[in-house]
């Protein structure tokens, strides 16, 4: 979910280029993940109250926001600079370090800054951001796409 959120923030899939920003701060990504998990959980609960069972009607297209939200919120919030895997900051940082090792982003730990690489830009531009795939990603994140 963290990776999906990162991708949606960097690439909006509209206009002559799909890339919508040059960098993202780690703290901003962490806040966006929390906000999107809360929004997805609220949508999931709303659908359950309306009698729409997400897991039987749309099982393949839906993320389990309840479990993800519980797991993410169970992580501690720590002071700036903490990199323990048991904190939200550390968890998001570990994911960014993984993406950095894969050559998909440049993660500058000192500045807590995330930038995409040409490798990720090309993958997103030519493989992921066709209309069908972008709409599925946005739907999974609880966003509407037109």
What is the meaning of each model-derived region?
Residues 26-36, 58, 119-128:
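Eukaryote-specific, cytoplasm-facing alpha-helical/coiled-coil scaffolding segments in long proteins
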Residues 30-40, 73-87:
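Short helix-coil junctions and helix-kink-helix linkers
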Residues 1-35, 48-51:
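Positively charged, polyanion-binding regions of nucleic-acid-associated proteins
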Residues 41-67:
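Histidine/lysine/aspartate-rich catalytic loop segments that bind and position anionic ligands
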Residues 112-119:
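Minor-groove-contacting beta-hairpin "wing" of winged helix-turn-helix DNA-binding domains
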Residues 84-101:
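Short amphipathic alpha-helical interaction segments
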Residues 96-112:
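A short, conserved structural fragment
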Residues 68-81, 120-146:
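Short, amphipathic alpha-helical interaction segments positioned at domain boundaries
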């Amino acid at each position: 979910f963290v990776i999906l959120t990162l991708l949606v923030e960097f690439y909006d899939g509209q206009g002559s280029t799909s890339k919508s920003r040059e960098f993202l701060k780690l703290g901003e990504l962490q806040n966006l993940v929390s906000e999107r998990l809360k929004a997805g959980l609220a949508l999931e609960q709303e659908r359950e109250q309306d009698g729409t069972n997400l897991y039987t009607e749309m099982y393949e297209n839906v993320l389990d926001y309840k479990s993800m939200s519980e797991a993410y919120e169970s992580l501690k919030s720590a002071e700036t600079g903490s990199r323990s895997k048991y904190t939200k900051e550390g968890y998001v940082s570990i994911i960014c370090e993984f993406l950095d090792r894969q050559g998909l982003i440049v993660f500058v730990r000192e500045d807590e800054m995330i930038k995409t690489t040409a490798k990720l830009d090309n993958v997103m531009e030519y493989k992921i951001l066709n209309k069908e795939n972008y709409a599925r990603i946005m739907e999974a994140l609880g966003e509407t796409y037109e």
